[in-house]
């Protein structure tokens, strides 16, 4: 796995699933391939994206700044600086300075990542802030190691939270989660179907599923009524893809 592929993997792991994630993935691919060279426009686009947390925007802004060639005097962006200040906690800043001194002596991606993993997410964000604000310089590889360690910590906590929700025994939460997943799957089906004539059937199935979820929410249904809803949709999607000559494994 190349360094940039690894960075892209870690960064995308903290972005919520949805159309925006696909858009960000495309932007990262373009940046890493040297196709997008307008840092100013890229940062303006990032700043106005909905849904993303300030920290995720800060990390993405840091990645873009490290990767896209820019004028030396280009102004640093406030939304990135605010996100990478470790919540203004002086303890985070103290640890960030210690981490920075270690990273300065480290030139490899994996070495920097290993060092950074022993620090808290707040200290890691502050350390990124130091480098972003040009208060310290490290090799690009070390900076990428720092970014990936931060993403790993964030992804770990997100995974724990997700696992708690998935394994919850509360039937109401499980019911709502199944309906949300079914609705999201239906939305994805509509986007994938496009405008071809054969797409009408897939669009119809997706539309009916979304209407069903809306009705279930409006009238209130038994928690078990949503069981299998998402899987039924996925089976319909696969059948549609097969007819279109597309062979894909299950989205599970």
Curated annotation (Swiss-Prot):
<protein>
    <recommendedName>
        <fullName>Matrix protein 1</fullName>
    </recommendedName>
</protein>
<dbReference type="Pfam" id="PF08289">
    <property type="entry name" value="Flu_M1_C"/>
</dbReference>
<dbReference type="InterPro" id="IPR037533">
    <property type="entry name" value="INFV_M1"/>
</dbReference>
<dbReference type="GO" id="GO:0016020">
    <property type="term" value="C:membrane"/>
</dbReference>
<dbReference type="InterPro" id="IPR015423">
    <property type="entry name" value="Flu_matrix_M1_N_sub1"/>
</dbReference>
<feature type="short sequence motif" description="Nuclear localization signal">
    <location>
        <begin position="101"/>
        <end position="105"/>
    </location>
</feature>
<dbReference type="InterPro" id="IPR001561">
    <property type="entry name" value="Flu_matrix_M1_N"/>
</dbReference>
<dbReference type="InterPro" id="IPR015799">
    <property type="entry name" value="Flu_matrix_M1_N_sub2"/>
</dbReference>
<comment type="similarity">
    <text>Belongs to the influenza viruses Matrix protein M1 family.</text>
</comment>
<comment type="function">
    <text>Plays critical roles in virus replication, from virus entry and uncoating to assembly and budding of the virus particle. M1 binding to ribonucleocapsids (RNPs) in nucleus seems to inhibit viral transcription. Interaction of viral NEP with M1-RNP is thought to promote nuclear export of the complex, which is targeted to the virion assembly site at the apical plasma membrane in polarized epithelial cells. Interactions with NA and HA may bring M1, a non-raft-associated protein, into lipid rafts. Forms a continuous shell on the inner side of the lipid bilayer in virion, where it binds the RNP.</text>
</comment>
<dbReference type="GO" id="GO:0042025">
    <property type="term" value="C:host cell nucleus"/>
</dbReference>
<keyword id="KW-0694">RNA-binding</keyword>
<dbReference type="Pfam" id="PF00598">
    <property type="entry name" value="Flu_M1"/>
</dbReference>
<keyword id="KW-0468">Viral matrix protein</keyword>
<dbReference type="InterPro" id="IPR013188">
    <property type="entry name" value="Flu_matrix_M1_C"/>
</dbReference>
<dbReference type="GO" id="GO:0055036">
    <property type="term" value="C:virion membrane"/>
</dbReference>
<feature type="region of interest" description="Membrane-binding">
    <location>
        <begin position="1"/>
        <end position="164"/>
    </location>
</feature>
<dbReference type="GO" id="GO:0046761">
    <property type="term" value="P:viral budding from plasma membrane"/>
</dbReference>
<keyword id="KW-0472">Membrane</keyword>
<keyword id="KW-0946">Virion</keyword>
<dbReference type="GO" id="GO:0039660">
    <property type="term" value="F:structural constituent of virion"/>
</dbReference>
<feature type="region of interest" description="RNP-binding">
    <location>
        <begin position="165"/>
        <end position="252"/>
    </location>
</feature>
<keyword id="KW-1048">Host nucleus</keyword>
<dbReference type="InterPro" id="IPR036039">
    <property type="entry name" value="Flu_matrix_M1"/>
</dbReference>
<dbReference type="GO" id="GO:0003723">
    <property type="term" value="F:RNA binding"/>
</dbReference>
<comment type="function">
    <text>Determines the virion's shape: spherical or filamentous. Clinical isolates of influenza are characterized by the presence of significant proportion of filamentous virions, whereas after multiple passage on eggs or cell culture, virions have only spherical morphology. Filamentous virions are thought to be important to infect neighboring cells, and spherical virions more suited to spread through aerosol between hosts organisms.</text>
</comment>
<comment type="subunit">
    <text>Homodimer and homomultimer. Interacts with NEP. Binds ribonucleocapsid by both interacting with genomic RNA and NP protein. May interact with HA and NA. Cannot bind NP without genomic RNA.</text>
</comment>
């Amino acid at each position: 796995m190349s360094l940039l592929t690894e960075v892209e993997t870690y960064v995308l792991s903290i972005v919520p699933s949805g159309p925006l994630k696909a858009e960000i993935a495309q932007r990262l691919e373009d940046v890493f391939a040297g196709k997008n060279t307008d840092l100013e426009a890229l940062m303006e686009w990032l700043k106005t994206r909905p849904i993303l947390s300030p920290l995720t925007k800060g990390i993405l802004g840091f990645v873009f700044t490290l990767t896209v060639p820019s004028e030396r005097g280009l102004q640093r962006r406030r939304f990135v600086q605010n996100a990478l200040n470790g919540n203004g906690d002086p303890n985070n800043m103290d640890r960030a300075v210690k981490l920075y001194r270690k990273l300065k002596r480290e030139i490899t991606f994996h070495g920097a990542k290993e060092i950074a993993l022993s620090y808290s997410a707040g200290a890691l964000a502050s350390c990124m802030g130091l480098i972003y604000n040009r208060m310290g310089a490290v090799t690009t590889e070390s900076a990428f190691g720092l970014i990936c360690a931060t993403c790993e910590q964030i992804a770990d906590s997100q995974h724990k939270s997700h696992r708690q929700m998935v394994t919850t025994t509360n039937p109401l939460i499980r019911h709502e989660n199944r309906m949300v997943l079914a609705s999201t799957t239906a939305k994805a089906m509509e986007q994938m179907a496009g405008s071809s004539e054969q797409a009408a059937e897939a669009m119809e199935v997706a539309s009916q599923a979304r209407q069903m979820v809306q009705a279930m929410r409006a009238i209130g249904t038994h928690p078990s009524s949503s069981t299998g809803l998402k899987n039924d949709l996925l089976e319909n999607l696969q059948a549609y893809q097969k007819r279109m000559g597309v062979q894909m494994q299950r989205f599970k």
